[in-house]
Design a protein with these regions (language model features):
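Positively charged n-region of N-terminal signal peptides that target proteins for export
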Residues: 1-6
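Bacterial N-terminal signal peptides
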Residues: 8-17
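Short sequence/structural segments immediately N-terminal
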Residues: 22-369
Length: 369
C-alpha cells in the first residue's frame, strides 16, 4: 500500500497545476503541512506561529520543492546562512563579520579536537553543539550531513530556534545562556549574578516597570540588532601590540608562547596565521580601540562616560594582574620541561606547555594550570 502522505501530496500537486505562481506555491505548502502534522506536529506548530507563516514564507522557500514523499526525504534541502540571506542579507553579512561565524573554525583549529570522543564531538550537547553556529564551507556541510549531523547548519537557528525563528527569543539573554555558561565560559553566571542580570530578571518577574533599564547581552553586544558580535579583548584576553608596561609586556609574551603563537624563543609560529584567520585576538591597537569605543558609547546610554571608562580600565587592570599569575604558572611548567622533569609529548612542537590543549594537557600540573 502506498504511503498515505505520498497519495495526499500527489493529489494536492495535481490541484496546484490549476493555479500558477503564488497559488501553486501555497497549495504545495499546504501539502507539506498536512503531511508533517502527522509526522512532526510541533515543527508545524512552530512554523504556523512564526513570522515566516505570517508573511507566507513556505516550507519550499528554505527546503526546496524536490522532497515530495516519505521515500525521498534526502531531497529536502537543509538551510544554511545563504538560505537565510535570500531575505536577510544584511543580518547574514553582519553575522559573517562577527566572531560567531568563526566558531566552527575555532573548534577545528584546536590541537586536540580530534582526540575527543566522537559522541562528544558529534552530539548536540558536546563542544560542536555550540560551535556549530560558525559558518561552514560547502564541503564541511557535506561531510557533516554524511555523518548524520545535519541539524544546525543554518547557524542562525542557534539563536532563532527552528521553526519559530523568533526575534523575541533571540533577543533574550536566555538564548545566549545555551552556550555561554559553565566552567570554561561562565558568562551567564557572571551576568545573571550581576546588577544587569538581576534587574533583567526582576523586570521579567514584574517587580520592575517594563520601561526600566535592564541591559541584556544583546543590549551591549548587538546594539540596534547588529549581528556582527565582537569584543575588544579576544580569547584569554590576549591582544597586540604589547603594552608599554614592560612587566606586563613580558607576561603577555609568555602567554603567547603558551598559546603556541610564539615559539620558546619568542618567534612567530604557524599558529599565528590561525589566530589571524579566526580573529582569536585583536592584533592592532586600532581594531581593539574600535571595539572599546563602541562599548563606551553603549555604556554611556545609562552611565556617565567617565564611569564607563573607569570601570573598563579596572577590568583592564584585572587582566594585567591575571596575566602575571598565568605567566608565572607557564614559566614554572616550562622550567620543568627544561629540567627534564616533564618529558616533551610526541605531538608537541616544543618542550613547552600548550594552553590550547586545555583539559587534554598531558600532565596533572598542566591541567591545573
Amino acid at each position: 500500500m502506498k504511503n498515505p502522505c505520498s497519495i495526499l501530496f500527489m493529489a494536492v500537486l495535481a490541484l496546484a497545476a490549476l493555479w500558477p505562481g503564488e497559488a501553486s506555491a501555497q497549495v504545495q505548502s499546504e501539502a507539506c503541512v498536512r503531511c508533517h502534522k502527522t509526522i512532526t506536529p510541533h515543527i508545524v506548530g512552530d512554523w504556523q506561529n512564526s513570522s515566516h507563516a505570517e508573511n507566507e514564507v513556505s516550507c519550499d522557500a528554505c527546503h526546496g520543492s524536490d522532497h515530495r514523499s516519505a521515500g525521498d526525504v534526502e531531497k529536502a534541502q537543509l538551510a544554511t546562512p545563504d538560505t537565510c540571506a535570500s531575505c536577510h542579507q544584511q543580518q547574514v553579512d553582519q553575522f559573517r563579520a562577527g566572531k560567531h561565524a568563526l566558531a566552527w573554525a575555532a573548534a577545528q583549529a584546536l590541537p586536540t579536537t580530534h582526540w575527543q570522543p566522537m559522541t562528544l564531538l558529534e552530539g548536540m550537547e558536546g563542544c560542536t553543539g555550540c560551535h556549530k553556529i560558525g559558518d561552514k564551507s560547502d564541503q564541511q556541510i557535506k561531510e557533516l550531513e554524511a555523518k548524520g549531523q545535519s541539524y544546525g547548519m543554518a547557524s542562525c537557528d542557534a539563536c532563532h530556534t527552528r521553526h519559530l525563528f523568533s526575534t523575541k527569543e533571540a533577543s533574550s539573554p536566555l538564548a545566549c545562556r545555551t552556550c555561554h555558561m559553565g566552567i570554561d565560559h561562565p558568562q551567564w553566571e557572571m551576568y545573571s549574578g550581576a546588577k544587569h542580570g538581576v534587574r533583567w530578571q526582576l523586570k521579567a518577574f514584574g517587580e520592575l516597570p517594563q520601561d526600566a533599564a535592564a541591559p541584556t547581552c544583546q543590549t551591549c553586544l548587538m546594539e540596534n540588532g547588529d549581528h556582527a558580535v565582537m569584543t575588544a579583548w579576544g580569547f584569554l584576553a590576549v591582544r597586540l601590540p604589547l603594552p608599554e608596561d614592560k612587566e606586563w609586556a613580558q607576561n603577555r609574551t609568555t602567554i603567547l608562547k603558551g598559546l603556541g603563537v610564539l615559539n620558546p624563543q619568542g618567534e612567530p609560529t604557524a599558529r599565528l596565521d590561525l589566530v589571524k584567520q579566526a580573529k582569536i585576538a585583536r592584533l592592532s591597537q586600532e581594531v581593539w580601540q574600535k571595539e572599546r569605543n563602541k562599548m563606551v558609547r553603549t555604556c554611556s546610554q545609562c552611565h556617565a562616560k567617565s564611569f564607563a571608562e573607569n570601570e573598563l580600565r579596572k577590568g583592564d587592570n584585572m587582566i594585567r594582574i591575571a596575566d602575571g599569575l598565568m605567566a608565572e604558572g607557564i614559566r614554572t611548567v616550562a622550567g620543568l620541561y627544561q629540567d627534564g622533569i616533564l618529558r616533551k609529548p610526541e605531538n608537541y612542537s616544543f618542550a613547552y606547555p600548550d594552553l590550547l590543549t586545555f583539559q587534554d594537557a598531558p600532565t596533572g600540573i598542566e591541567q591545573e594550570l
